From Swiss-Prot:
Record protein name field: NAD-capped RNA hydrolase NudC
Record-listed a divalent metal cation 1 binding positions: A158, E178, E219
EC annotation from Swiss-Prot or TrEMBL: 3.6.1.-, 3.6.1.22
PROSITE patterns: NUDIX, NUDIX_BOX
Length: 257
């Protein structure tokens, strides 16, 4: 799976280090390896996009290292592969030694895993499941400003799934903890890999059941009901949060217009 890059190799290049991505000119590099000074480097084939290979290269470039969010507006399939590259680069960087016996580890040749030659333990990339939910009450949707997003963006509620918890239980707990309300009629919508960090977003829609909004000030700045045709600043297109909001708006339009 891992090999030395040759002069004629071409494709999409996910050059990553410490969860950063090399974006010369603000774009994901595409073309022949020689044009990006990649010949002789180690590369891992992580997929294909539009008939061309996608390669992950673990390397820190002095300039143009940015965030994966900068390519969020590209095609979802390419964004997903770039996210895979970042997560794999971070996985290999953080698993050089075995967590059980402390001996050095090496990469598997048959799968994305790290192996310990001493105790035979096998490690796989960490994936953190999260829930994200759009909550509707009549013609309105619950939107909140998160403390970590002080840019005026209002979005739906989300959170990590805890150990020993189902996705449904996670939705009920997160909604109650952050907003103080209860929900009903939970429906699964879609999922999205989201490497900020190593998350798998599982998206739901739900209906308001009971309770008054009581904001968890540790997590949220504000939370309120917004009529579907009078919404504040929203997350960018391409995010699963935006998808949930747009789906809720479409349902409201169909019912109230």
């Amino acid at each position: 799976m891992d090999r030395i890059i040759e002069k004629l190799d071409r494709g999409w290049w996910v050059v990553s280090h410490e969860q950063k991505l090399w974006l010369p000119g603000g774009e994901l590099p595409h073309g022949e390896a020689v044009n990006f000074d990649l010949v002789g480097q180690h590369a891992l084939h992580i997929g294909e996009w539009q008939g061309e290979s996608v390669w992950m290269v673990r390397q820190d470039r002095r300039h143009d290292m940015g965030s994966l969010r900068q390519v969020l507006d590209q095609d979802p399939g390419l964004f997903q592969l770039a996210g895979r590259g970042i997560q794999l680069a971070e996985f290999y960087r953080s698993h050089k030694f075995c967590g059980y016996c402390g001996h050095p580890m090496h990469a598997s040749k048959s799968e994305w895993a790290m192996l310990c030659s001493h105790c035979r333990e096998r490690y796989y990339p960490q994936i953190a499941p999260c829930i994200i939910v759009a909550i509707r009450r009549d013609d309105s949707i619950l939107l909140a400003q998160h403390t970590r997003h002080r840019n005026g963006v209002h979005t739906v509620l989300a959170g990590f799934v805890e150990v020993g918890e189902t996705l449904e239980q996670a939705v009920a707990r997160e909604v109650m903890e952050e907003s103080g309300i209860k929900v009903k009629n939970l429906r699964y919508v879609t999922s999205q890999p989201w490497p900020f960090p190593q998350s798998l977003m599982t998206a739901f829609m739900a209906d308001y059941a009971d309770g008054d909004i009581v904001v968890d000030k540790k997590e949220l700045l504000t939370a309120d009901w917004y009529r579907y045709d009078n919404l504040p600043l929203l997350p960018p297109p391409g995010t699963v949060a935006r998808r949930l909001i747009e789906d809720t708006v479409a349902m409201c339009r169909a019912e109230f217009e």
